[in-house]
Amino acid sequence: MPTPSAQLDQGIISSNGGTSGVSASSTRFRHRKISVKQKLRVYKASDLKDLDQDELQQRELQEIETGVEKNEEREVHLHKILQKNQLQLQDLYIPTPDASRVWKEFDEMYQGRFTTPASYIQFSVQLEDCCGPAYNMDERDEAYLAELNGGESEALTEDEFELLMTNFESAIRERQPFLAMDPESLLMYEDLKPTMLKNDIGDAGLKTELAAELQLGDQPFVTKFDSPATLRTRNMVELIEKYGAEVYEYWKKRKVEVAGGSIIPSLKAERSTDKDDNDPYFCFRRREVRQTRKTRRVDTQNSQKLRLLYQQLQYTKELALLVAKREKMSMDMLLRDREIFQLRCDIKTVKRGLGIKGEDELLISQKRRKLVSNVITNKKYVSTQADAAALRRLRVAKVKDKKLLSKQLSSTDLKRQQSQLQKLDQQQRQQQQQQQPQINGAQCQQDGSGVSHVYVKLPTSKIPDIVLEDVDKVLSMKERNTKRFVEEKMKKRREEDGDIFFNLTDDPYNPVFEITIPQNISPTNAPFSSIVSSNFEISRSYYTPNLQNCITGNTNSVLAYNKEGEIVESQKYKKIEFYSPFEEKNDSHTREIPVRFRRRLGRYGVEYIDRKDVSRNPSDLLGEFMDFSLIAEQEQSSDAVNVYDSQLDELFRLHDKWKYDSDHNAYGIKFSDEPSRLNQISNETQVIRFGTMLGTKSYEQLREATLKYRQNVMAQRKKLVNAQRQQQQQQQEQQEQEHQQA
């Protein structure tokens, strides 16, 4: 009696008695229960001897990798070729299009020759798909456009026609998204017109928005990638008013032909309802891939990454707009300078023609002063204002709390409560006074650690979003603070010394020497340095009392005394040389050297010294930096002037800076580039690291101040609550005592 096969689970048995075979995508075999609804094949006794061998061959065949995707192995032609019994046949093949023929009309349709450029051909498919209209014309559109124009002077171009068709598609997609259910219910042109006027087709709306942000006015927004054809495209409002009604009828006809679908050519993709695997026009087929399980932690990380990416893109957009605005401003400045130059050229010709002679200051561009950013001063002002406001709110809250307590408590309880509060305040003040030295020491340690460890690597979570400052600004601020500190220290020391000490180290004066120069050395060529003059013989040295009278100019007579205290009479000098950094205000400062001297030799070796007065030039270069009239007014006035507001002191600092300061060191490298060179990183990275360190420090200080403020507020609230509870307990105890006495 024939028995059914033991391997019934290898495939589904068809209605005609034949099995479809084991699925090519499955290499595992699982025994299933025999179902009553399935048809089973019945084998005869003669088939049993070859049954096991066929089963093994079939398993071996399906375990071999075919090199074809598992979903594609079910295709009809591939399935026939991959069958066991069809491997030996020679007439089986996969149908492919015939590419051996030559298209005769190729030269007529495609003209022109391609020349290989010098550089690579650069393109971006994703970006080009988003630029311009999405609709592409075909042969029918070309014939209709030729009929529509009909030899008009202002004909509708192909680009404008594609813009109109794209606008119609966008408007109907927005107003009737389910038009495919009923294609005949298409809206009229009057209903679609308002939506079409609002739509942003292509990049026209984006360019208009960018032009408004950059304040270009009526100028067109032209980029480097715009072709000349796009620049000649008319406005959408004008196209709709002139050609909208006629193009609507043609578009409506095309829309009805495709049963309400999209008339824009697109690739055919498999939808969720389509399951036809044999359709060769499907470009992409869906795959049923099992989705991996995700935890909330992964979702949170992904959302944070997306949020950070969006923020970075916003920063990039703002940065690009700022760069564009800056370049536009620089271009406007160049154009204005060019106009000014042309006007100056015209003025020259006019003055020459009229014979006008005068100053030429208008023909020379004056130097502009460098603008100084006041970001640091604004930050300090905002922080001080915030601290003052917080203290004011705290005081108002204390006053309100005291008023509430005074209303609720009786007179005796109020006195008792006030005494308790006074004791608590005294204790807090004592604790604060005891803790103040510790806090100051901790702050000094923090400052020292911040100075010694400037560059600290922080995690991204602790880096706040701040505006980075330039290294030059930070270094200049540091240098100004150092100079101010030194000046304050010197001023303080001078005030402490007064008239008691005469400090020769801080206020040196040149001693009066009579140097005997050897006869073989010319006095005109003798060096005047202290090292070389030590080789010469010094005859006598003197000291002079009452130097202040001589310095201030109250006396012209100078008395010199030798070491025995005797007055030495000498006609070689009338006034000693001196130098005092604290008495420089008493000297006369001019814009330029008042006189010039020239030494020349005459006959018989006679030396002559010629003096020449310097003519005053109204367009003095120093006048661009300093206002000498303001300095004179400030010095002549009797009002006390702050040391930081003194114009004369600013002139001294400017002179010293011009004389001694240098932006480069001995090796020719900028001082601002030294830290980056020391750390072996780029200067931009050094700027970011330094700014991050400053921002982190300020952020931590603000956080600590906020926490201290919150702790103080919570402590005050707790004190208030405890005082109220004590008051309630005392009232209850008094009531209980009264009840007991009653």
UniProtKB/Swiss-Prot annotation:
Domain of life according to the entry: Eukaryota
Location comes to:
Nucleus
GO molecular function terms here?
A: histone acetyltransferase activity
Recorded GO cellular component terms are: NuA4 histone acetyltransferase complex; nucleosome; nucleus; piccolo histone acetyltransferase complex
What Gene Ontology biological process does one annotation of this record name? DNA repair
Claim: DNA repair is one of the keywords in the record: yes
Spans annotated as Disordered: 1-28, 416-446, 718-742
**Annotated Polar residues bias:** 1-27
Which keywords does UniProt give here? Cell cycle, DNA damage, DNA repair, Nucleus, Transcription, Transcription regulation
Residue spans with biased composition (Low complexity)? 724-734
Biological role stated in the UniProt entry:
Component of the NuA4 histone acetyltransferase complex which is involved in transcriptional activation of selected genes principally by acetylation of nucleosomal histone H4 and H2A. The NuA4 complex is also involved in DNA repair. Involved in gene silencing by neighboring heterochromatin, blockage of the silencing spreading along the chromosome, and required for cell cycle progression through G2/M.
| Assembly | Component of the NuA4 histone acetyltransferase complex.
The protein's matches in PANTHER family, at most eight in alphabetical order, are given as: ENHANCER OF POLYCOMB
Q: Which family does it belong to?
A: Belongs to the enhancer of polycomb family.
Q: What is this protein called?
A: Enhancer of polycomb-like protein 1
Q: Give the source species.
A: Eremothecium gossypii (strain ATCC 10895 / CBS 109.51 / FGSC 9923 / NRRL Y-1056)
State the taxonomy lineage: Eukaryota, Fungi, Dikarya, Ascomycota, Saccharomycotina
Provide the gene name from the record.
EPL1
